[in-house]
């Protein structure tokens, strides 16, 4: 096995070690830098330790330790991961990246994309679909509301969020407190937004209480009014 090592002694001549892996990353070359690097040319695996930074196209991923496979372009960062990609800013204890698309972030995950913040113990994000999945203890905070649920699916490109299991939605700006088994939030930009609550649905606004198997909350334009029209079904 042939292993090329860049050891701490080289720090006498450079503050940061880095290698460019354009020969393996196709149209999107990867640059890896760290205090120390080990590269196995047979397996194509890079092991980086200390002040690790991976840069590819418009994404920058940092952490304490990382492994990167140049052949399948899979990366894993531990010791506090921080990803910045376009309008996404994500922090977590660890992070795995697959196929330049799937991101699996674990441990106190905080993901910010535009006006939406997603938190949970683990977030799976698919960048091509702009789809995020949180399977437990999930929270999503939008412009003027917050939703918690056992499971959350966020379709960020469509401004749509589906919460399943023990759903709780609050909005201080609109004075809403609502619960249900399932909630679907549509934050349409060019249309009236709405929230559909299903299963043991209950909504409270300004002391008014509505209950039903299904409730639809139509959200008025916040710039004009904080009114919410609730339609039982």
Per-range role (PLM):
Residues 1-233:
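Mature-chain termini and adjacent capping regions
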